[in-house]
Amino acid sequence: MIRLVAGNPLTRDAVMEEISAVADAGLEFHVVPGMSLPSTVPSFAGIALGSTYTEADLTNGPVDWDQLASAPQPLVFQATQEHLAEMAEALMERGFQGATPVTITTNGTTRLQRTFDATLQTVGNLDADLSGALVVTLGTVADDRSKYSWWENRPLYGWRVLVPRAKEQAGPMNARLTQYGAIPQSVPTISLEPPRNPAQMDRAI
């Protein structure tokens, strides 16, 4: 049996309970740690977190804003759009400036990733499609991401490109388009197949 978990499995309470049950039963198991979204997505957004930062999941129950407000920055949150206004209000009440840079990344690490820039003052009213899970990076490092952006600034990033080639010939073109950030979609226009009746081919020759 394989259990797939987003990020590091040993940070999930439900997974730990399952591992404990397996261990108590005397069964063998292996854990393959992955990188958590808060540590991975900012890199894909061009944000250099540095060696010290604080991450928190705003979707996982009550949030201790007092502790987060005094934690080492930058702050990296897992959140949804519904959490943004509450986050901004809570942190500004605890001394954060409204001009503090904030980035919001949706569909992180995929070819549909989009990163939006805001401030703590404006993030709650951001006019953007922020559906699904978000990774929010807050702090001065968010203001420098243009220096290190490498994923979303590729020349064809986000373009859907039709590749009208025979299925067997589309591979190299699809690979090149992907390198430039495009999303290739093969449209087979030619199919090379053996003759259904070899006798007809022999007569034609």
Stretch-by-stretch model annotation:
Residues M1-A6, D13-S20, N60-K167, P172-A175:
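A contiguous loop/helix-start segment that scaffolds small-molecule binding in enzyme catalytic cores
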Residues M1-V32, L134, T189, P194-R196, ...:
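Class I S-adenosyl-L-methionine
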Residues I19-P42, G50-T59:
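Short, acidic/small-residue loops that bind anionic groups at enzyme active sites
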Residues A21, A45-S51, Q121-T122, D202-A204:
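Short, hinge-like loop/turn segments at secondary-structure boundaries
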Residues L27, F96, G181-I183:
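Short phosphate-binding/catalytic loops that engage adenosine nucleotides
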Residues S36-T40, A56, L84-A85, T109-L112, ...:
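Short gly/pro/ser/thr-enriched loop/turn and capping motifs at secondary-structure boundaries
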Residues S39-P42, G61-V63, L112-F116, P194-A199:
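Short, charged, surface-exposed secondary-structure boundary motifs
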Residues V163-I205:
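A cross-family signal for N-terminal binding/gating loops and helix N-caps
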